[in-house]
Amino acid sequence: MEKFHAQYEMLETIGQGGCAKVKLARHRLTGTHVAVKMIPKREYWCKLLMFEAELLMMFNHPNIISLLQVIETKKKVYLIMELCEGKSLYQHIQNAGYLQEDEARPLFKQLLSAMNYCHNQGIVHRDLTPDNIMVEKDGRVKNIDFGLSTHVKPGQKLNLFCGTYPFSAPEVLLSRPYGGPKIDVWTLGVVLYFMVIGKIPFDAASIEKLRKQIVAGKYSAPCRLSVKLQHLINLLMTDNPELRPTVAEVMVHPWITKGSGVFPDPCEEQIPLKPDPAIVKPMGHIGFQAQDIEDSLRQRKFNETMASYCLLKKQILKECDRPIRDQPMNPSVTPFPSLVDTPTFHLGLRRRETEPTGLRLSANRQVSVCGKSTSKKRDRSFIWPGVLSRPINTTPTMDQTHTRTRSVPCIYSNVCTIHPNSIDESTEGHTSASAEDKPVHSRGWPRGIKGWTRKIGNAMRKLCCCIPSKETSHLGQSRVCPKK
């Protein structure tokens, strides 16, 4: 218990199952919110839920929920997973009524990508319902529940009846041995119907009537649907499983490939096998070892190191997309970065030679996880220093070793410069950075004659050790005199 609470702050309950609770928690190091499934160590239920955890450990796909860490105590097992910030597909459709075909297509393509990935891994879902699918704010789809999933071998037949009745395939309701992947295809048809119609295709007042409807495979399809979409739905919900297509075959259907035929990037892995040096280096400043980070990711240890890396990466990517705030935040206010109070700096900061080198991204280039980039129209650049440890008692100076504290990690957010070339042009007219320069504060540089007079006066005072400087420290940081 202490091991868990040392890393996470438990918040409210966000889900309740038959034998496990799902809690919202905050990662203390990064301030990132996560979902935590708490599994009591009861022999029967624990085995079933731990099998789901084993499946999640196998997965690494952008449309499948990511397991980040497993913490085991005497009484409970904690599964720390990424938090999906959005609504279930059921809620999404309820709010919209139904989706237009062009709205449903990108969501359904993500479902196909996830199911094709699972089937290639020898996993069948068996309970793919709108309640088990999340739609995030950016339109990304996530499959979140694999509680009824199982391994299958090619050609293997299953006998266990499980799933949600209105979404079950006819062969399951007839208590016949069934092929796992084919029942997932049927369920995809029911889900697609629900997305574009706003209701499920089979509905009856009793279980027996519902069973007869599903076995007969009879349902109504509105005329407003395109011919290609009607054909796809009929194909997915073919009552004979032998004639039902595979997910791979569905992915090349004309309705699916209409417009952009691009599926989610298969190389966009949630948990990379090779760490990014831009994240490894700052993690070293707060106590992590580079070799441990590499081993944890490559071997998928699901430990504290692996979780911290993934959450730091997620927060950095989120910061890259976050708009720049109008007012700078005081870095000394919040000891740990959080979603509420992340330190930011004013526009137009000048990076001096002694500041840590950051990763410079241009807003007209969108860098993908695979290293590819696409062009955008805007011409704006971001300085992304990555994850840095905030210096408390020292200020970066020329030709001095930088002292960093490991007790107060901090993630600096983006610094936007509207005209990148203006930085170089403005710095050419000034003298090079030296130990006598005044630190760059969020309020900006002194302007006008008075500002330069004050700046020169402070520099002269520091040249003479007997004359104390009138400058006071800002943001809780003290000045460090240059070495003689």
UniProtKB/Swiss-Prot annotation:
InterPro entries: Kinase-like_dom_sf, Prot_kinase_dom, Tyr_kinase_AS
Keyword Kinase: yes
Active-site residues annotated for this sequence: 127 (proton acceptor)
Residues holding ATP: 14-22, 37
Known catalytic reactions: L-seryl-[protein] + ATP = O-phospho-L-seryl-[protein] + ADP + H(+); L-threonyl-[protein] + ATP = O-phospho-L-threonyl-[protein] + ADP + H(+)
Tissue specificity comment: Testis-specific. Expressed in the testis from 22 days postpartum (22 dpp).
Compositional bias annotation for Polar residues: 423-434
Single GO MF annotation: protein serine kinase activity
Domain annotation UBA: ranges: 274-314
Highest taxon of the lineage: Eukaryota
Region of interest: Disordered: 423-447
One Pfam family hit: Pkinase
PROSITE patterns: PROTEIN_KINASE_DOM, PROTEIN_KINASE_TYR
Family membership: Belongs to the protein kinase superfamily. Tyr protein kinase family. Smok subfamily.
Function: May play a role in sperm motility, especially in the regulation of flagellar function.
Identification of the protein by name: Sperm motility kinase 1
Gene source species: Mus musculus
Name of the gene encoding the protein in the UniProt record: Smok1
